[in-house]
Amino acid sequence: MFSGGGGPLSPGGKSAARAASGFFVPAGPRGAGRGPPPCLRQNFYNPYLAPVGTQQKPTGPTQRHTYYSECDEFRFIAPRVLDEDAPPEKRAGVHDGHLKRAPKVYCGGDERDVLRVGSGGFWPRRSRLWGGVDHAPAGFNPTVTVFHVYDILENVEHAYGMRAAQFHARFMDAITPTGTVITLLGLTPEGHRVAVHVYGTRQYFYMNKEEVDRHLQCRAPRDLCERMAAALRESPGASFRGISADHFEAEVVERTDVYYYETRPALFYRVYVRSGRVLSYLCDNFCPAIKKYEGGVDATTRFILDNPGFVTFGWYRLKPGRNNTLAQPRVPMAFGTSSDVEFNCTADNLAIEGGMSDLPAYKLMCFDIECKAGGEDELAFPVAGHPEDLVIQISCLLYDLSTTALEHVLLFSLGSCDLPESHLTELAARGLPTPVVLEFDSEFEMLLAFMTLVKQYGPEFVTGYNIINFDWPFLLAKLTDIYKVPLDGYGRMNGRGVFRVWDIGQSHFQKRSKIKVNGMVNIDMYGIITDKIKLSSYKLNAVAEAVLKDKKKDLSYRDIPAYYAAGPAQRGVIGEYCIQDSLLVGQLFFKFLPHLELSAVARLAGINITRTIYDGQQIRVFTCLLRLADQKGFILPDTQGRFRGAGGEAPKRPAAAREDEERPEEEGEDEDEREEGGGEREPEGARETAGRHVGYQGARVLDPTSGFHVNPVVVFDFASLYPSIIQAHNLCFSTLSLRADAVAHLEAGKDYLEIEVGGRRLFFVKAHVRESLLSILLRDWLAMRKQIRSRIPQSSPEEAVLLDKQQAAIKVVCNSVYGFTGVQHGLLPCLHVAATVTTIGREMLLATREYVHARWAAFEQLLADFPEAADMRAPGPYSMRIIYGDTDSIFVLCRGLTAAGLTAVGDKMASHISRALFLPPIKLECEKTFTKLLLIAKKKYIGVIYGGKMLIKGVDLVRKNNCAFINRTSRALVDLLFYDDTVSGAAAALAERPAEEWLARPLPEGLQAFGAVLVDAHRRITDPERDIQDFVLTAELSRHPRAYTNKRLAHLTVYYKLMARRAQVPSIKDRIPYVIVAQTREVEETVARLAALRELDATAPGDEPAPPAALPCPAKRPRETPSHADPPGGASKPRKLLVSELAEDPAYAIAHGVALNTDYYFSHLLGVACVTFKALFGNNAKITESLLKRFIPEVWHPPDDVAARLRAAGFGAVGAGATAEETRRMLHRAFDTLA
């Protein structure tokens, strides 16, 4: 038998032929389900496998594009389990060789070349050109005047590389000898994909003219251009050897450095550069002694900011430019993208189309991949760099973003695949498209088909679940490392584009990735979900249950190899699992509509959506500040040497925070619409936090008066505290001075604010002297937000959603301003501004406390300010006292007043304080009134708001790593405390006396119901029939296990046990479930073996897990096995294991009847209760635990062998009495009997 390439099949080829022959004979109806009946595939091309080292590179990229439009040889890797007629011993591992034929795809009994373009393709196609051939229908010539932009690209073109006959002279001039071209990607209202190439945009930077002339002896701008060109030509390497002074243009302008009030306008050289690469080199290396300004601003930002009104996401219109010049359509053969139409123009040919707000028919692709290890251990986690570890299926759902309609469902399968009829019926019943199942002989063919779909269909938006950290990196590593496929042509650009994933560091020890694809916006729903909602587990199934009230048919990773090897029908089960994952993610996408909020932020900040997703808060504020600074004649210095000048010294870092200070709320939290929740933050000091080095003082916290308060507590909040402080006090880089002589000519108090921060005197001039740039930004944004919110009630539902996302985007950016100034290594830090904000915040808290205590010390004074207070008097003495101050909140305990009355008059009280103490726009608002409040510590409290709603903040009661049993019991105790008036009264009496007193006296009778809950909890913990699922704890795997300093953690123990048992190990960021089990001989043996595995894993290279070591599998035994077992035969007593060593996988514990550690669980419950209720006992945790234990009878749980001996001797179990006296009588009788 011979292949088309000539020559007999090698032994490897015969195996591949067997694999293919089993694959090509369909076992039943194909997954498309409702198409024509399948038939035997015709014209099967037998694989010809050559040794790996002899492969010629696949025929691929032509001169004008770098995606594959033709291929006649490729590396063939396929699992041997597809050899369905082969004996079992021949079905292990993979075929790996080279095949000389075109890549094939099979669907519904039909066969096609993957790269062939023609009618009736297996997947939808939107690209006009393919492989340099125009496939547009006859007469296709769309007229484009209006188009929507969703992405902006930039690249450098060279005149000598272009066909001058195809370009107008003005475009050739813009790239002679080289020039930056901005490409706007978008869609027309009719759905045509458009690319508009904008010529003439230039990046630039500034240098002080006096310094340049002195250092370089320049007499004219041209001299500077010559000096820069010479420096570039002399640089290492050959990159800049052809640079001449014509690459630059310099002009003299007047500007002011944004730092410090005393800085005066000066002359600067503005140097225009034709490429970002040259700009970066000059700013980093040319005359380092001379400060550079705005050298890090990219060409896209310059394009947006230098053309007022331009946006990164919105509708544009083509119009005649200067001298009536028009945009030039490109001929198809000159297209640089996979668009339907392309234009060349300059910025003056563009205008914003303000009358349109709807989105065009953008396409959304939702995908998911399934992988399988192909080595000796099929249960190992697949590694992309291993050729034998394969992608076996890819589900791909295609939506219309404007209508949310699901238009296509595709399943790419390595090997034949028959989707279950039940799944097809379910999809049809839901009105969803029938899946098209695409089958492939090899992994390369499947991956090439998927990437060909990405190129030909070109979805503008892509989503999935954890695709940024897993799916995309795995696919791209496979394509580039194993198959050597260039990816730069698979985005919207046909070549020289970007399609890559890279690590961007760690956040809270989690490795994070970033993806950039030209013309494709990737929005990972995993990141959206973890940012928007708090759950105990972020697995897709848990998220679907919590958010969508839906769940999927789960398929264990351990089952995938067996299902895959079992044939087309069982592979269809994997396919159903893969498709339903994508369906759930699609539903989540349209539930949260993340593209609307992200695009609104992008518009406001002047950056594209990809930067909005991945580049953090800093760039958003920086770009807005850059725009405003240019309007006001300021320039922003680059980071290096920022604090030179203005006194000549770098500022001292403000002192670290004291114990009574805390870090301010993180950026992104809006003080006037804050959601309650969260825990304590670590004390502020100079430290590194997720890449942020902050060194300013935190906000002052007024120490809480701990206890159980049953009188009303009014909570006043400062609305948008930090933004309002910046506005009220005119704080900014440009209004700050570190020198007293700089403001000596001004009047203190009237013209400037003097304040001491961290032991240093700072001066900020008032707005009538120089208006703060930060204040202007905040004022404009807040006014815009107010206007948008006012439109929402009168809008249609669709428009209201869009407007709500816009106002939310403004809120996010507003709350980023304060944090922007406080990051020491940020884009434009000013720690003095950040420290001043928190200092003023502390002073405001103290001023409010003094005012309330003095102004309303007597009821008559309150009545004088608020006559309506006469109707809010309650029995008992009157007093008003602040019991807690928390960054931007003030808690006021009001005795002798009703909660209803305080709620009614609260806003008036807040306004009164605001007018008396603060400058506008700072204002207090009455946020809520607690009827009962358990105040535990800073940022830890539980209370019932007037109206009945309970609010819990910072308390273990709601921690997601507690088990369900402890959470339920804790919640029951809290409900009793707040909603049972008898218990509430007893608790209040308890809290009024010193805790030590209760050690010598009985607890109040009203706490009996409270104790009954604890007794019932103890009974349930010791019940042999308990449900283990109620006792499952979870902890997040925040980084690779080797990266943990403390290895003695419960969830790490379970991780290594799963590894040793060859089970699927969790991924980083997953929450690992575990239970704590009793210490037995089997557990001790497991711990010993696990220690060896940890040692082995610590020395394993890279991120690959160590080879598993077998763990003992205990015989099934009753769950009531005791917590501790006596050593047999009088042997030495074994070491008591750590709690972390007793952690076990819940599924394993259930399957093997492993006993729970009842002592641990009850101790843990008491620990949680002590943390919650210690405020009743003066915050003395030791006394709290001692008193709570009074409710629990002392019960000894003997080991099995001891219990058997006692029964044999005639002893019986005696339970506790209903009361302490009854128990005492029973014990007295027992001891008399024993005596």
Swiss-Prot record:
Subcellular location(s) per record: Host nucleus
A GO-annotated cellular component: host cell nucleus
Database matches in InterPro entries: DNA-dir_DNA_pol_B, DNA-dir_DNA_pol_B_CS, DNA-dir_DNA_pol_B_exonuc, DNA-dir_DNA_pol_B_multi_dom, DNA/RNA_pol_sf, DNA_pol_B_thumb, DNA_pol_palm_dom_sf, DNA_pol_type-B
GO terms of biological process kind: DNA-templated DNA replication; viral DNA genome replication
Compositionally skewed regions (Basic and acidic residues) per UniProt: 650-661, 676-691
SMART domains: POLBc
PROSITE patterns tied to this protein: DNA_POLYMERASE_B
UniProt keyword list: DNA replication, DNA-binding, DNA-directed DNA polymerase, Endonuclease, Host nucleus, Hydrolase, Multifunctional enzyme, Nuclease, Nucleotidyltransferase, Transferase, Viral DNA replication
Acidic residues bias: start-end ranges: 662-675
Catalytic activity: DNA(n) + a 2'-deoxyribonucleoside 5'-triphosphate = DNA(n+1) + diphosphate; Endonucleolytic cleavage to 5'-phosphomonoester
Annotated region described as Disordered, given as residue ranges: 640-692, 1098-1134
Location, primary (coarse class): host cell
E.C. code: 2.7.7.7, 3.1.26.4
Single Gene Ontology MF annotation: RNA-DNA hybrid ribonuclease activity
Subunit structure: Forms a complex with the ssDNA-binding protein UL29, the DNA polymerase processivity factor, and the alkaline exonuclease. Interacts with the putative helicase-primase complex subunit UL8; this interaction may coordinate leading and lagging strand DNA synthesis at the replication fork.
Function: Replicates viral genomic DNA. The replication complex is composed of six viral proteins: the DNA polymerase, processivity factor, primase, primase-associated factor, helicase, and ssDNA-binding protein. Additionally, the polymerase contains an intrinsic ribonuclease H (RNase H) activity that specifically degrades RNA/DNA heteroduplexes or duplex DNA substrates in the 5' to 3' direction. Therefore, it can catalyze the excision of the RNA primers that initiate the synthesis of Okazaki fragments at a replication fork during viral DNA replication.
UniProt record similarity statement: Belongs to the DNA polymerase type-B family.
Name of this protein: DNA polymerase catalytic subunit
Organism from which the protein derives: Human herpesvirus 1 (strain Angelotti)
